[in-house]
Amino acid sequence: MKKLLCALLCVFLLSAALPVLCEDPEEELSMDEIVEAVDLDAPEAGEWTFPVALEDLNPDFVRLANKHYLLEKDYYTKPLVKVKALKLKNGENTNGGVRKASGGTMELQQDCYEALVALSDAAREDGYNLYLKSAYRSWQTQNTMYKNRLKKNNGKDDGWVSKAGASDHQTGLGCDVIPKSWLKASGMNSKMAKEPECIWMAEHCQEYGFIIRYPADKEEMTEINYEPWHLRYVGIPAATYIMENGLCLEEFNDELQAAIQEYLENGGDRSKVEKLIQVPNGEYKGKTSF
C-alpha cells in the first residue's frame, strides 16, 4: 500500500512537472508515458526483497559449512538431543525415535531431530524404511576422519570426506540417511540414488525442512561428490525455495548474501540481518563490503 501511494504521488508530481521540463513546452506526455517513468518495482528504503522472509531465516539453520566457510572448533555449544532407537507398537512410533543403522550414540539439534522423526514416520507410512547412519560430528572427530581418508588415498582429497570445520555434520543439522539394503555395505556411493527410499527422500525432504545437501549436478560448487543420502536441515521455507529452484546451499548462500547487501545499501536495519551475514574464512577469501 505504501509503495502504491508513493507511486501515485510520483505520478501526480511528474504529471505536473513534465510539461514544464519538456524541450517542447507544447508537447505533453500521456499518462501511460508518465507511469512508465515510475519504477513500481524499485524496493522501498529498508525493504527485504529476498524470496524467503527474514522471520523464516534462522541463522543456525542456513549456516554454510564448507572449506571456504569453516566452522570454529567450538561452533555449536548448545545441548544436542540424543537420537532414540525407534519403538513401534501396532505400527505407531511410541517413543519419538528413528531407525538407527548402528547402536552407537548419535545427536542432532532439537529442530532437526523432530523434523527427521516426522520425515521418517511419513516415509514408513508410504512403505519406506529409513535408517540414520550418521548425525552430529565434532570438529575433532571430523579432523581424524579427514586425515585417515588422506592416508588411504596417498594424501589426495577425493571429495568423500570434508576437512575439519567444513563438515555439515558439525552443525548438528546434517544427517546421513540410508535404505535398509545398504546397511551392510562397506561404503556409500552415488548408486544409492536409484534406491526407492532415496528417490522418496529427494521428492519429499523439503516438506520437513530438509534439502539434499550435495546434489548430483552441483559438484563443482559444493566440491563434494553427489551424496543422495545426505540431508541437511534448513527449515521448511528455505528448504522449499532451495529444492523448488534446484539450488545447492552454496548458491542459496550467494543469493542470500547479495540480498543482505542490497537490503543494507537501501537503509535496512543491520541488527535484523547481522547473524545471517557470512564471510569466507577458508581457502578462498572473496571480497565483501559488509
Question: What spans do the regions from the language model cover?
Answer:
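Sec-dependent N-terminal signal peptides of Gram-positive bacterial secreted proteins and lipoproteins
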Residues: 3-22
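Extracytoplasmic cell-surface/polysaccharide-interacting catalytic and binding patches
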Residues: 22-135, 139-290
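Intrinsic low-complexity, intrinsically disordered segments enriched in polar/basic residues
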Residues: 2-3, 204
